[in-house]
Amino acid sequence: MQRRELSGSAVALVTPFKKDLTVDEEALRRLVNFQIENGTDIIIPCGTTGESPTLTNEEQVQVIKIVCDEARGKAQVAAGAGTNSTIHAIELAKAAEAAGASAILSVAPYYNKPSQEGFYQHYKGIANAVSVPIIIYNVPGRTGSNIAVDTIIRLAEDLGNVLAVKEASGNMSQITEMLNRRPEKLAVLSGDDPLILPVMALGGDGIISVAANQVPKTVKDLVEAMFASDLTTAQKIHNQYYNLFTLNFIESNPVPVKYTLAKMGLIEEVYRLPLVPLSSSSKAKLDAELVQLGLVEASATA
């Protein structure tokens, strides 16, 4: 299977906080090294999983700089830098590029529900403002509107640095159409861990993963198995970790993931409002899966 420039196993990295709610630089560097040691190809700070809606612009730049410093020469860094104001999104993209990001992940404008022409002009403005590659992030469940396949293809054909799309629509018909019609340069990345196998089986280029925060080597192995057309291995990994993939969304992302990472001793379990800790019932379900997979000891969930 062909490997495009932005392909493979990418992690949507969490942002660790201290108890005073400031960014925990030591823990962030630890997380980046955990990813590098386990073969992650692309590290994505300041996305949805990184709690970007509750980070200030200054904090986003701080996080991106730390990640770029720690990952330099070892993994690509595609920084989350999107918002629903085109002017602001351009400012964020420029700041991310200046901070050292090798690519930009830009979420579709949310809440204001632009037309398809509005989506096009939004991304055109961003792409023309920076020189690094752009990953379009289509996530209708969060934004309230869907970027059509025609629009994504138009953007990729017209703009030299639009090189990938993170497809988190969950719509396999739409993803299939995109894979069948895309220009050669465009990488199509699954935005949902449970869909890594089917999307890559259809010709997709990898995953921007939530679960890679917890099990980076597992996600990497699944992606590599699909690149190698080793469906037997891929199915085994997919089936073994499918429950974890889905339990990561038992409550708002990234709460289950940060809960897990705290149990693993990698971060403190701290969120910024309006995100709150898991309910007792959700903890019990997630704990059982974490113990079964050997990610934590049973004593750690007592």
Swiss-Prot record:
It is found in: Cytoplasm. One of its GO terms (biological process) is lysine biosynthetic process via diaminopimelate. Keywords: Amino-acid biosynthesis, Cytoplasm, Diaminopimelate biosynthesis, Lyase, Lysine biosynthesis, Schiff base. Pfam families: DHDPS. It comes from the Bacteria. Its EC number is 4.3.3.7. Pyruvate binds at T49, I208. Homotetramer; dimer of dimers. Belongs to the DapA family. This is 4-hydroxy-tetrahydrodipicolinate synthase. It comes from Chloroherpeton thalassium (strain ATCC 35110 / GB-78).
